[in-house]
Amino acid sequence: LDEHYLSHFDYLDVDSVIQEQKAFGACRDVTLEYPVAENEGEEDNTYLSYNMVVGNAADSQMAMAFEVLDYALLSAPGAPLKQALLDVKAGKDVYGSYDDGILQPYFTVIAKGSNPDRKEEFVSVIRQVLGNIVKNGIDKKAVEAGINYFEFRYREADFSSYPKGLMYSLDILGDWLYEKGNPFAQVQQLTVFENLKKAVNEGYFEELIRKYLLENPHGCIMTLVPKKGLAAQREKELEEKLEAYRSSLSEEQLDAMVEKTKALEAYQEAGEDPKALECIPMLKRSDIKREAAK
């Protein structure tokens, strides 16, 4: 690949670093709409979410700690935060997630099947439950169960029908993309699990809740409200935008666009040239070492 292709091009030093979003001065309140069908009800169809940015992609221990918190607070049997929200009927279902596949991971709590007028109570219950946990301590057995659950999954490395090597490479890519920390930390997690087991009795998880879920200005409370006819409205706006763009083009520009489209379709439908395929180097059995690398 290098000898026959890459070596014929000049190296470019491209600034591909993804910049971090600056923290908000205060938690934001956002209301958005999403489309529903005409025969679908709008009542009990709102989504409420409590979202906080937590750390960065390089901190593998914090990432695993928030996975454990998601389990202990919202997924485990009798999870306190989920149960409290269900008790006040904040929504028909409550769940959470932690996403560390981006530069600045976030933790979210979601109430599905709710209404806009439940937002204040939704937020109040979350803060009350989390505040009590910080003050009185988290359920250590639930946290330990979460750590054991994720450690077992890590040791088993059962990715179902997906190749293990592919899944490991995707884990590594999560850190590698952002040029932070050690990319291999994602596949060297045993030390992380040992540290978390010790941290259970050191107030570590309570401090994460206080710092990132209660006193963190970098977050938002989102209300996602259903609206009938929104899909048709957006489609009409897009058609008008495209028609305005089309009207701005000359006949020559339109003809050139048509020709480019035809050329693209012809390229996509054409089969591979056998001679081109023969140029691809094939791995020979003699290229493979008998001994595994140590």
Give residue ranges: language-model regions.
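Conserved catalytic-core segments centered on acid/base and nucleophilic motifs
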Residues: L1, V109-A111, L130-V134
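Short aromatic/hydrophobic-glycine micro-motifs
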Residues: K89-G91, D175, N182
